[in-house]
Amino acid sequence: MPRPILATIHPAAVHHNLERARRAAPDARVWAVVKANAYGHGIERVFEGLRAADGFALLDLAEAERVRALGWRGPILLLEGVFEPRDLELCSRLGLWHAVHCDAQIDWLAAHKTQVPHRVFLKMNSGMNRLGFTPERYRSAWARLNALPQVDEISCMTHFSDADGPRGIAHQVQAFQAATQDLPGERCIANSAALLRHGGDAQVRLDWVRAGIVLYGSAPDHPERRAADWDLQPTMTLASRIIGVQQLQAGDTVGYGSRFTAQGPLGIGIVACGYADGYPRHCDTGTPVLVNGVRTRTIGRVSMDMLAVDLTPVPGAGLGAEVTLWGRAANGAVLPIDEVAQAGGTIGYELMCALAPRVPVVVQD
């Protein structure tokens, strides 16, 4: 019999979150961002929940081929563009749109022989300082692309560095507007945080929005706001079961390093889940967890294959009791992945992407 740990993906929740993104940015078309294998969920597992998207945005050609293999005939955007000249041939064959963020990519297009002109998104570095042309160089890059017979349509895009933070987006919006003024083509600047917080602003939603983490039920601005505050549903549940029970007395310690000491009699459950499954090792005593749908806490240090939970709120729980590490329990109770991530000093994005290959995954609506 296999270990009782299991990850469950919920395509219906993905669909719900996609529709929530649409409501946040009325009249804009939605790129469903499925990079990093749909944020660890599996592109094939969430595809049905995303069929209503206007396009798929991702990182590499292998992911694009997988989306096409699923029968998608609409737009697909390579968010980082091509990584070498020969990639352009496959872009043409698959009908991909791709970002252009540096001079080398323009040079590759200029040298590319094709009968199918490319549709590109010219990326501006408006303050993120990762990829893109600075505002001062943006128009000259646009002119170079516009002169190429290999390019059919040029759209404009940028990425916000602090859409969910105190600095905000006004300075980047202003830089983008100034550099793209009077240039033809569609616009795309809003990521998940921007579309939730500023999607009602026509200067932000523009023609396209990029829905990423919002699709997967995580709040981009947690802990200021929770996923439920945005009407987002959990799309991944990680669950296991209690495989052992211990009755502690005052002075007993738990786990490696004896980081927890019982102050009195205490029942604990040992759960078949550890950092080798993708659960964050930095989650110390007090991290929220659900046992039979009842909220309790972890006890002591997370080990490779196991962790301990406090059974005080669920005294009847024993061997085989359901443990929800994040997501939705059988009784409908929800433990947001963002809460677990915060306890581990990270973000929900990372936990989704870090789910270990040894964890079985099923799809359930």
Swiss-Prot record:
The active site is at K35 (proton acceptor), Y256 (proton acceptor). Pathway: Amino-acid biosynthesis; D-alanine biosynthesis; D-alanine from L-alanine: step 1/1. Disulfide bonds: none annotated. GO terms for molecular function: alanine racemase activity; pyridoxal phosphate binding. It catalyses: L-alanine = D-alanine. Keywords: Isomerase, Pyridoxal phosphate. Coiled coil: none annotated. Its EC number is 5.1.1.1. It comes from the Bacteria. The keyword Isomerase applies. One of its GO terms (biological process) is D-alanine biosynthetic process. SMART domains: Ala_racemase_C. This is Alanine racemase.
